[in-house]
């Protein structure tokens, strides 16, 4: 598996074979070029973290998940540990409650939502709307379009104020 960005409820990570082996990640969906995944975790008490766990752990902060030896970790202003999770062979330490996505190093005010949030949209970025690989920016979308997108998608990325990124999952009957 080549490196790619995977959006998870815990944040965004650059996935490589190593991370995929360390974390129990399952791919759930795609939104255009973005992969939507889930990390199977079990919350643990922070006091149960051992020194040996710290040698191979990950940190979640401001919408990004990085390994403990990442250069990106130096940019994190970590003041506290909010929670800790065990996943497969490692620990993930959450250092804030921010679920804002950090996609491709552009800290953006976007969050992962169920596709029902498409009904709050005034602007839609739609991938794969009419044909595979297409992209459309739609201002003031119709309710009919929103309904069709809702039925074709499971997730969307939203700023919470009306800007939605969604995948139309084009097929022969879409928008007919």
Swiss-Prot record:
Alphabetic keyword roster: Host endosome, Host-virus interaction, Inhibition of host adaptive immune response by virus, Inhibition of host MHC class II molecule presentation by virus, Signal, Viral immunoevasion
Major location (coarse): host cell
Induction entry: Expressed in the early phase of the viral replicative cycle.
GO BP, one annotated term: symbiont-mediated suppression of host antigen processing and presentation of peptide antigen via MHC class II
Official protein name in the record: Protein OPG163
Source organism, top-level taxon: Viruses
InterPro entries the UniProt entry points to: Chordopox_A35R
Function of the protein: Mildly affects the expression of MHC class II molecules on the surface of host antigen presenting cells (APCs).
Record-linked Pfam families: Chordopox_A35R (PF05989)
Leader peptide range in chain numbering: 1-14
Localization annotation: Host endosome
Family to which the UniProt record says this protein belongs: Belongs to the orthopoxvirus OPG163 family.
GO CC entries: host cell endosome
Name of the coding gene: OPG163
């Amino acid at each position: 598996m080549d490196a790619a960005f995977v959006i998870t409820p815990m944040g965004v990570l650059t996935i490589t074979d190593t991370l995929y082996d360390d974390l129990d990640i399952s791919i759930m969906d795609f939104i255009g070029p973005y992969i939507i995944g889930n990390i199977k975790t079990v919350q643990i008490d922070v006091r149960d973290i051992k020194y040996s766990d710290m040698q191979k752990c990950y940190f979640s902060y401001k919408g990004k998940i990085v390994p403990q030896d990442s250069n990106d970790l130096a940019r994190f202003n970590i003041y506290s540990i909010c929670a800790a999770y065990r996943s497969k062979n490692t620990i993930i330490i959450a250092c804030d409650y921010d679920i804002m996505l950090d996609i491709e190093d552009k800290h953006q005010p976007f969050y992962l939502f169920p596709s029902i949030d498409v009904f709050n949209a005034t602007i839609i970025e739609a991938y794969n709307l009419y044909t595979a690989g297409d992209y459309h920016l739609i201002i003031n979308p119709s309710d009919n379009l929103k309904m069709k997108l809702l039925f074709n998608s499971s997730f969307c990325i939203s700023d919470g104020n009306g800007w939605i990124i969604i995948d139309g999952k084009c097929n022969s009957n879409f928008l007919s």
